[in-house]
Amino acid sequence: MIDFDTDSDQIKAKAEEQMVIVAGFMKEYPETTALVAGHTDDVGSPAYNMKLSQRRADCVMNTLITKFGIAKSRLSAKGYGDTRRLEYNTSAEGRKKNRRVEVWVDCVLVKN
């Protein structure tokens, strides 16, 4: 999970480690695909948050492509706005946990 500041689509430096893990797994298992899912807190209008969440997802997806060499055909990005919260948005801590991108990797591991 990659967290974001309020009203920002900029990836924080501390997210590098998480991106390395995702990219490493996808390189080790080249048949995998991933959904990059962007989310927001409930500050702002639903329409604005939908666009912000999409920008966050696009930013993470583009970083996986350009910095880590993951093929674009293996990735898709979707913004969910504030529709899939992890916590209630009634506190600063709750809102912080909802400002995130999740990368869901789909794969089938075959035992030899």
Where are these regions (language model features)?
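Acidic/histidine-rich, surface-exposed loop or edge segments in extracytoplasmic proteins
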Residues: 1-5
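Periplasmic OmpA-like peptidoglycan-binding domain that tethers envelope proteins to the cell wall
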Residues: 10-16, 37-112
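Sec/Tat-exported extracytoplasmic proteins
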Residues: 23-26, 30, 67-68
